[in-house]
Amino acid sequence: MSTVSQAMRKDLKKTTHDATVSKAAKLMRDDRVGSLLVVKNEEVVGIVTETDIVRRAVAQGSDLSKMTVQSIMTSPVVTIEGNRTIQDAHDMMGDLGVRHLGVTDRGTLVGLVSVRDLLISFKSISEPKITQD
């Protein structure tokens, strides 16, 4: 079975803790991602997702141009070691009710894996391989 490190994205998109929710949403749109790592003084302090924006800001009727990412982010980032299986990541996401996991290598954050990344990995495993003899 594939490992989390094989399914993860290494190109981590980030925003600062004091960025507005509006700015973060535009960054997600422009970069075509569903989450951003949140940094403060070069340290990852959380993650903000599309779901966070919808549930914790938009649905509350908040002014997205005045609300900061820090007020709606999830902190700390839930992580999984990269050598674990994609099934382990799937189970962890289900158990914890999250759609994104930070991927670590001996405790250092090296990537991010989303539900979408797992679906792509599961699909590639389950598709029959066509070979020519």
Describe the function of each predicted region:
Residues 28-31, 36-52, 93, 101-116:
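A glycine-centered beta-loop-beta connector
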Residues 14-32, 79-97, 104, 122:
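The conserved cystathionine-beta-synthase
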Residues 2-12, 66-77:
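Bateman (tandem CBS) regulatory domains
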